[in-house]
Amino acid sequence: MLKAVFFDIDDTLYDTSGFAKLARKAALNVMIDAGLPLTQEEAYKLLREIISEKGSNYDRHFNVLTKTVFGEEKPLLIALGMITYHNVKFALLRPFPNTTSTLIDLKSKGYRLGVISNGITIKQWEKLIRLGIHHFFDEVVTSDEVGFEKPNIRIFEEALRRMGCKPERSVMVGNKFNEDILGATNAGMSAILVNSELTEAERDHVEKNGLDVTVIDDISQLKEIL
């Protein structure tokens, strides 16, 4: 019988990608109005390239953007971009429609809930607090804190250790096959893929290796299967 349910945060509990895209475009519009000599399409393409190269947790994307365009950093444009990005993102931030009710349901059934996330500890806690769901989780384990990123099994093993739970009595819920699903199953856990679909190659891997993987369209389906 399952005892613990672990969740990824981004694009699992809330629409990270959608909110970030809106916030980035709003920030670029403000920077363009203040003198960035690019169209929004050009600026967004460049920003996406920078994010792809540096990673989403890098905190100087706008610094790199202005240095690329001007040959030097432009503090005013950087500050305008950062302020707008954070203001818009936090104004929009909310869980997926069925996230909170699902967490309530799982807690009422006696499950212990945890988070396993690649990211900076304070930033991940800030997301959970702003989403209004931090109090549901018994443990929040981040790559920043433990020194290993998903899919490395050591971050899953550390989460299980803190929760005091065996892998066969735990399940990981996430939207990324390589990070969440493979990482969890390699650690001996079952896994549930949400807000995504298995590719043919991923499905073949699951079947060939006899992995305990379930695919759902919406987080609310956890109420039925757990």
Curated annotation (Swiss-Prot):
Keywords: Hydrolase, Magnesium, Metal-binding
EC number: 3.1.3.-
A GO molecular function held by the record: phosphatase activity
Top EC group: hydrolase
Top-level taxonomic group: Archaea
Gene Ontology terms describing biological process: small molecule biosynthetic process
Cofactor(s) this protein cannot do without: Mg(2+)
SUPFAM superfamilies in the cross-refs: HAD-like (SSF56784)
Function: Catalyzes the dephosphorylation of D,L-glyceraldehyde 3-phosphate in vitro.
NCBIfam families named in the record: CTE7, HAD-SF-IA-v1, HAD-SF-IIIA
Similarity field: Belongs to the HAD-like hydrolase superfamily.
Protein name stated in the entry: Glyceraldehyde 3-phosphate phosphatase
Species name: Methanothermobacter thermautotrophicus (strain ATCC 29096 / DSM 1053 / JCM 10044 / NBRC 100330 / Delta H) (Methanobacterium thermoautotrophicum)
Lineage: Archaea, Methanobacteriati, Methanobacteriota, Methanomada group, Methanobacteria
